[in-house]
Amino acid sequence: MKYFVVALALVAAFACIAESKPAESEHELAEVEEENELADLEDAVWLEHLADLSDLEEARGFFGNTWKKIKGKADKIMLKKAVKIMVKKEGITKEEAQAKVDAMSKKQIRLYLLKYYGKKALQKASEKL
């Protein structure tokens, strides 16, 4: 269970990176240059390097693709978990449980798993008290 939580945290981190703000535009850098009255050539070179931040766009694309892969694998794991839980909880065959899960939307599957693991966590917490 804790591996699932860690994986979920990583997915959230990748999503935040993928949704992050794009690099500053040349126009914004020109405004900064005017505000700071940069006369020094080294400062101007530094600002040019800031304007050439295409690596951030490439990284964002990489994390976006990675996010999609992780999300796909997480969805497959959730489907398998939902089938296992239904077989155990309802006492039906694996094929029947698979048919029920296939009929459910991804949102319904997530809610089903959250309810199951929420009840399980509540029971463990009440036992410790």
Curated annotation (Swiss-Prot):
One GO CC annotation: extracellular region
Main localization, broad class: secreted
GO BP terms in the entry: defense response to Gram-negative bacterium; defense response to Gram-positive bacterium; killing of cells of another organism
Single GO molecular function: toxin activity
InterPro entries from the UniProt entry: Latarcin_precursor (IPR018802)
Protein name (Swiss-Prot/TrEMBL): M-zodatoxin-Lt8d
Keyword Secreted included in the entry's annotation: yes
This protein's domain notes: Both the N-terminus (61-94) and the C-terminus (99-129) of the mature peptide form alpha-helices which probably disrupt target cell membranes. The linker region (95-98) probably derives from a processing quadruplet motif (PQM), found in propeptides of many zodatoxins, hinting at a fusion of two originally separate membrane-active peptides.
Function: Insecticidal, cytolytic and antimicrobial peptide. Forms voltage-dependent, ion-permeable channels in membranes. At high concentration causes cell membrane lysis.
Locus of motif Processing quadruplet motif: 57-60
Post-translational changes noted in the entry: Cleavage of the propeptide depends on the processing quadruplet motif (XXXR, with at least one of X being E).
Gene designation: cit 1-4
Domain of life the protein comes from: Eukaryota
Compartments (UniProt record): Secreted
Signal peptide interval: 1-20
Keyword terms: Antibiotic, Antimicrobial, Cytolysis, Hemolysis, Secreted, Signal, Toxin
Similarity annotation: Belongs to the cationic peptide 06 (cytoinsectotoxin) family.
